[in-house]
Amino acid sequence: MFVTFEGIDGSGKTAQLTAAGEFLKASGKQVVLTREPGTISCIRDYVLASDMDIRTEALLYSADRAENIAKNVIPALNAGKVVLQDRYLDSFLAYQLADNKLVETDIMRLFEFSSQGLRPDLTLLFDLTPACAQERLENRDRIERKPIDFHSKVRNIYLKLSADNTDRIRVIDASQSFSKIHQQVIYHIERKLGGTHSA
């Protein structure tokens, strides 16, 4: 099963992904944790630190995705493992569209090519206001330092995507306590896996 964790910077999705991975491993599941970008370390370092043309940025993200899907995600899924990924389709759409420089058809064309058309079985969207998220962030990278209006656009795009994809995306209120959020994460994952767990 392929589960993606989405949300604006500072929403807490990465910490929840780590906690979910530990829980599933303790439950006897084989789990692989991945992130986007991150497969090709030099690409991650470059896109998070350098100003660049929006097309260059989209292509670099896509190159990293292509490598991750081919080398990590698909082999793990074929082996029956649970893949938990930090950012994927919805982040790519939300952040690229928020810049208002690329059209959705071009973004999706890049995504389809780089992802081999692979869609998540489940997406957990950690929703938080940009003002609250900004308070949590320290040592911000290039994207995290963008104006709050940009992050508001990203959040609104995420929420629209969730409304358009209710079969796949589950929205979680990220202003709750860590333990409450964790319970909801496990509930949604186990429900998708076919198990039972009370939220």
UniProtKB/Swiss-Prot annotation:
Q: Which InterPro entries match?
A: P-loop_NTPase, Thymidylate_kin-like_dom, Thymidylate_kinase
What GO molecular functions are on record for this protein? ATP binding; dTMP kinase activity
Query: What positions does the entry give for ATP binding?
Result: G7, I8, D9, G10, S11, G12, K13, T14
Could you say which EC number(s) this protein's record lists? Answer: 2.7.4.9
Source species, domain of life: Bacteria
Q: Where is the signal peptide?
A: none
Q: GO annotations under biological process?
A: dTDP biosynthetic process; dTTP biosynthetic process; dUDP biosynthetic process
Q: Which CDD domains match?
A: TMPK (cd01672)
What are the GO cellular component annotations?
A: cytosol
The UniProt keywords, alphabetically, are:
ATP-binding, Kinase, Nucleotide biosynthesis, Nucleotide-binding, Transferase
- Please list the reactions this protein catalyses: dTMP + ATP = dTDP + ADP
Give the UniProt family note. Belongs to the thymidylate kinase family.
Q: Per its database record, what is this protein's job?
A: Phosphorylation of dTMP to form dTDP in both de novo and salvage pathways of dTTP synthesis.
Q: What protein am I looking at?
A: Thymidylate kinase
